[in-house]
Amino acid sequence: MLTKRIIACLDVKDGRVVKGTQFKNHKDMGDIIELARYYSQNGIDELVFYDIAASARKERISREWVSEVAKNINIPFCVAGGIKSEEDAAELLANGADKISINSPALNDPSLITRLAKSFGVQCVVVGIDSFKDENGNLKVFQYTGDEKTSKHSGKSTLEWVKEVQDLGAGEIVLNMMNQDGVKNGYDLEQLEAVYKICKIPLIASGGAGKMEHFLEAFKLGIDGALAASVFHQKLIDIKELKIYLKNQGLSIRI
């Protein structure tokens, strides 16, 4: 049985960690390095940093904080936001990131997934998918979601895009379920299961965790990792207690 991963997500904007609800109304959560160090010391398996404004503003991620994070933690971390080329990815990996994640740039240029996988190996290439469920239950991929003014439907359906990114060479998918983001009432299990059924690569659930049982429900579907932000930033769930709880439920967890 593969070890399940508990991942903390740190949304970065203007050099600070922020958190919104359903990708809106972002509030300051603290210093990037301090939070990274806190999570590294308190049992999180992996960190994901999303520069949520980089793609929307057509900016580059600051290499300075990426390098500082690498110096201050001893767990794997992934960086996302505005990565449009092999050169962008190479710089971030050279500054200490273990993986890079692409979202809107992959929708604009799907071949970027293949090029990154060939240059750095599939294990380094994560594709983030911002999935919105409309009033009819249709799953739609959105892009430029870091800013309410730029967020829009990409024209692709979630399930179609999940299949496509796998064929293009993605090594992992993070499914960001937009409707559930920050509301703490559980992952969208119906959506998660639909994606998991067609996913042949590691799948990470994101959006909706509010209590320990929510992580268990998601892991029972077979997914590889569960990502959360609000419950960890606000210390509503203790990471070490969560891991013990999941291990006691029979899951393979790194304590």
Swiss-Prot record:
Gene Ontology process terms (BP): L-histidine biosynthetic process
Pathway noted in the entry: Amino-acid biosynthesis; L-histidine biosynthesis; L-histidine from 5-phospho-alpha-D-ribose 1-diphosphate: step 5/9
Sorted UniProt keywords: Amino-acid biosynthesis, Cytoplasm, Histidine biosynthesis, Lyase
Broad EC category: lyase
Enzyme Commission designation: 4.3.2.10
GO CC terms, sorted: cytoplasm
Major location category of this protein: cytoplasm
Reaction it catalyzes: 5-[(5-phospho-1-deoxy-D-ribulos-1-ylimino)methylamino]-1-(5-phospho-beta-D-ribosyl)imidazole-4-carboxamide + L-glutamine = D-erythro-1-(imidazol-4-yl)glycerol 3-phosphate + 5-amino-1-(5-phospho-beta-D-ribosyl)imidazole-4-carboxamide + L-glutamate + H(+)
CDD domains the UniProt entry points to: HisF
One Pfam family here: His_biosynth
Catalytic residues (UniProt): D11, D130
Gene Ontology molecular function: imidazoleglycerol-phosphate synthase activity; lyase activity
Cross-referenced InterPro entries: Aldolase_TIM, His_biosynth, HisF, IGPS_HisA/HisF, RibuloseP-bd_barrel
Compartment(s): Cytoplasm
Stored NCBIfam families: hisF
Annotated family: Belongs to the HisA/HisF family.
Known partners and oligomeric status: Heterodimer of HisH and HisF.
Function: IGPS catalyzes the conversion of PRFAR and glutamine to IGP, AICAR and glutamate. The HisF subunit catalyzes the cyclization activity that produces IGP and AICAR from PRFAR using the ammonia provided by the HisH subunit.
Protein name per its UniProtKB record: Imidazole glycerol phosphate synthase subunit HisF
Source species of the chain: Campylobacter jejuni subsp. doylei (strain ATCC BAA-1458 / RM4099 / 269.97)
Gene label: hisF
